[in-house]
Amino acid sequence: MHYLYLFISIATEIIGTSFLKTSEGFTKLWPTLGTLLSFGICFYFLSLTIKFLPLNITYATWAGLGLVLTTIISVIVFKENVNLISIISIGLIVIGVVLLNVFGESH
């Protein structure tokens, strides 16, 4: 169940970040409200996750996968560019998250 909470937290963080981009500095009402609601849900489920999983693994997974998926969305939806160094760096983040989850401290 705790990995479901983490997944919901990551998904709503990505949604919130996408709304943040479209809010244009909090000048657009609906994207601003979407940002606030999404991040509220995100941090609620993140707080539930850290009740069950170690903070270091939870945060690394949340931040790492959030960054990777947000980058993918920024390329697909917002037509932003990434270079080779960015792609390699994102690959290293994915490797780090996997290693932490496989070999990191667990309860």
Swiss-Prot record:
Family membership: Belongs to the drug/metabolite transporter (DMT) superfamily. Small multidrug resistance (SMR) (TC 2.A.7.1) family.
NCBIfam families: qac_SMR_G, QacCGHJ
Pfam families documented for this protein: Multi_Drug_Res (PF00893)
Chain's role: Multidrug exporter. Is implicated for the resistance to bacteriocidal quaternary ammonium compounds.
The UniProt record lists the keyword Chaperone: no
InterPro entries: Small_drug/metabolite_transptr, Small_multidrug_res
UniProt KW Transmembrane keyword: yes
Organism the protein comes from: Staphylococcus sp. (strain ST94)
Membrane-topology annotation of the record: Multi-pass membrane protein
Keyword field: Cell membrane, Membrane, Plasmid, Transmembrane, Transmembrane helix, Transport
Main location: membrane
GO biological process, alphabetically ordered: glycine betaine transport
GO molecular function term, any single one: choline transmembrane transporter activity
Superkingdom, taxonomy of origin: Bacteria
Transmembrane segments: 1-21, 26-46, 57-77, 84-104
Name of the protein described by the UniProt record: Quaternary ammonium compound-resistance protein QacG
Cellular location(s): Cell membrane
Source lineage: Bacteria, Bacillati, Bacillota, Bacilli, Bacillales
Listed GO CC annotations: plasma membrane
